[in-house]
Amino acid sequence: MSIQNSLPDYQSFDETLHQQSVALTAAEMHGLISGLLCGGNRDSSWQVLVHDLANDGLAFSHPLAQKLRELREITFESLDDSNFAFGLLLPDEEDNVFERADALAGWVNHFLLGLGVAQPKFADRKEISEIIGDLRNIGLLGYEEGDDQEELSQALEEVLEYVQVAAQLCYIAFTEPKTVLIAKNDKPTLH
């Protein structure tokens, strides 16, 4: 099973969030968690940050908290994967293209929120400033109900690919790969 295929089912996860009275969609939650990870957040503080940003500072129920931990772990593994397996949690391709466009815009906006919380001065980084500008524009994604759905679908796929690469570039800019961290931790201790 590929890492991409191990993301939860969008509709099911979205319903779980709604049932728990979380104001974020599944796409927005995944964007937020992805942004925190890409900003270099590696410790358990991510949970408190997600509580603050998505649930008025209140902890989630145990079942939802477990699903969020699993989502974070899958996302972390996919970002750290050398095969670039990172994917976005969005509605299925068979779903309405307008819903997918809205979900992508929500994912991007919450990704930028998470990135900004983890890296408050991310805009100062020259190597990613253009990417951040592009993501901000994508977050404002708009369409007309009368737009050709086929054209919009093709454009959406291109933008989606760009967002995936942009997120991975942010991850590379702000974090060290897991293998480097493991190597640092495995250094012998000098007594």
From Swiss-Prot:
GO cellular component: cytosol
Transmembrane segments: none
Pfam families: UPF0149
Domain of life: Bacteria
Ranges in coiled-coil conformation: none
SUPFAM superfamilies: YgfB-like
Gene3D superfamilies membership: YgfB uncharacterised protein family UPF0149, PF03695
UniProt-listed HAMAP family: UPF0149 (MF_00346)
Family the UniProt entry places it in: Belongs to the UPF0149 family.
Protein name per Swiss-Prot or TrEMBL: UPF0149 protein plu3602
Organism this protein belongs to: Photorhabdus laumondii subsp. laumondii (strain DSM 15139 / CIP 105565 / TT01) (Photorhabdus luminescens subsp. laumondii)
